[in-house]
A protein has these predicted regions:
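Secondary-structure junction/capping motif
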Residues: 19, 69, 178-179
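Amphipathic alpha-helical substructures
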Residues: 10, 28-132
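Zinc-dependent metallopeptidase catalytic helix centered on the HExxH motif
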Residues: 1-14
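Beta/coil-rich, acidic/histidine-enriched accessory regions frequently appended to metallopeptidases
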Residues: 84-209
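Active-site-adjacent bridging/hinge elements
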Residues: 17-33
Length: 209
């Protein structure tokens, strides 16, 4: 499940263009109103947010030698709220988190929340004895646990687009930045009716062959 979540975020070019804070702030007019270019322009605040929480928890545990965790931080936040019944400003959560743990976490918050740099997943997971292995896999794979066979065979070529198959061809719905479809100058709403002289009756099958 974790590998699948990491893969979904890494396969989204939007992670390099939209910060986590921006994703959360614009959720109602971008994330919930996606268009044909959304995979290239936005990142899911659900998926990247979950990975950010994981990294923060592991970072706190490592830097505090196990004395604190994200759970203990959230419990203290809840106790604070019970005492005052008041909310907190946007960035006060980060300030309070550092006060509770006694740690300087500014660099992490800046990277995770306000930049488009990738999360330090490998480094954080390593503190818990987990090795993160990156493998070249087709987009349809979805991610998972690596095994001895993962690197034994080259991955199937990735078409680089989503499409809707019809009886007389395949209509592209999304074209991913940097993929084969974009490199071939294909665009959303383009219709493929022929592949190497054969009618495009099953693009997924014909492409894999």
């Amino acid at each position: 499940l974790l590998a699948q979540g990491i893969t979904r975020v890494q396969q989204t070019q939007g992670r390099l263009k939209q910060t986590l804070a921006e994703s959360s702030f614009t959720a109602w007019n971008k994330f919930y109103k996606q268009d044909e270019n959304s995979p290239n322009a936005i990142v899911s605040y659900y998926q990247k947010g979950a990975l950010t929480a994981l990294c923060l928890d592991l970072l706190i545990r490592s830097k505090s030698a196990g004395r604190h965790s994200l759970d203990s931080v959230m419990r203290q936040h809840y106790r604070d709220w019970c005492a005052t019944r008041q909310g907190i400003p946007e960035k006060q959560w980060q300030v309070r988190c550092q006060e509770i743990t006694g740690l300087n976490l500014e660099d992490f918050f800046q990277t995770a929340l306000y930049s488009t740099r990738d999360l330090p997943l490998a480094e954080c997971l390593a503190t818990a004895g987990v090795v993160l292995t990156w493998c070249a896999l087709p987009r349809s794979h979805g991610g998972g646990l690596a095994d001895a066979k993962t690197d034994s065979f080259p991955p199937a070529p990735d078409f680089g687009a989503r499409f809707k198959q019809n009886g007389d061809g395949a209509t592209l719905t999304h074209v991913f930045n940097g993929g084969s479809a974009e490199n071939a100058a294909l665009c959303p709403q383009d219709k493929i009716i022929d592949l190497n002289g054969f009618a495009c009756t099953d693009l997924a099958l014909q492409w894999s062959q």
